């Protein structure tokens, strides 16, 4: 009876079991959970933004190169040639020249693979042959390129609207007013400059609106509510795409 009581007592069995075996069992249970409970397909599906890696890298490289070129042209070159310091331009003016260049280049990368794919199909003589791996990967990331293009375009619009809030711009207005008084000019109106800026702003607003329309219709919940003809007209129709570009 005493031995049977010891055997049926769970606490005694736990104490009687060697510690090494307990650690081995814990290790096996952990290894079992890591190996079978989380397969490789699920681990791949849980990666952080896998389709955004390539577009973000390309956008970062383009933005860095464009920033360096603009910095050399707008700041370093005047400093080296005429000893004029324009470092105050870096936070707003230099950045605002980088944003539209990157945005329009990313937008071009959205529609360029479609043209390349058509050329490849003509070269192969059929549309049922698989595309090269690099082209297939590029076409799968067109949505991400388009959203990044919209992101840089919105930033460009915000930076442009902030021009009038800069302290340097206010000082320039005072200098222009003083120069106008010194030159005895009652009216500083320049017709072609006015028309040029009005057209620039108008086309920028229209382009941003169309780009936002394309981005909204690419959302799955919105695209599912559209018919195939409506989606094809907005996303694939060449006139809207090239008008945006």
UniProtKB/Swiss-Prot annotation:
Q: Which gene encodes it?
A: STEAP1B
Q: Which Pfam families match?
A: Ferric_reduct
Give an example GO cellular component term for this record: endosome
Which cysteine pairs are joined by S-S bonds? none
Mark the transmembrane ranges.
Answer: 52-72, 100-120, 145-165, 199-219
Question: Where is this protein primarily located?
Answer: membrane
- Identify its protein family: Belongs to the STEAP family.
For this protein's source organism, the top of the classification is: Eukaryota, Metazoa, Chordata, Craniata, Vertebrata
Q: Which domain of life is it from?
A: Eukaryota
Q: Does the keyword Magnesium apply?
A: no
Q: Does the keyword Transcription apply?
A: no
Origin organism is Homo sapiens
Q: What sections of the sequence does the record tag as coiled-coil?
A: none
- Keyword annotations from UniProtKB, A to Z: Membrane, Transmembrane, Transmembrane helix
* Membrane topology classification: Multi-pass membrane protein
Q: Where in the cell is it found?
A: Membrane
Q: What name goes with this protein?
A: STEAP family member 1B
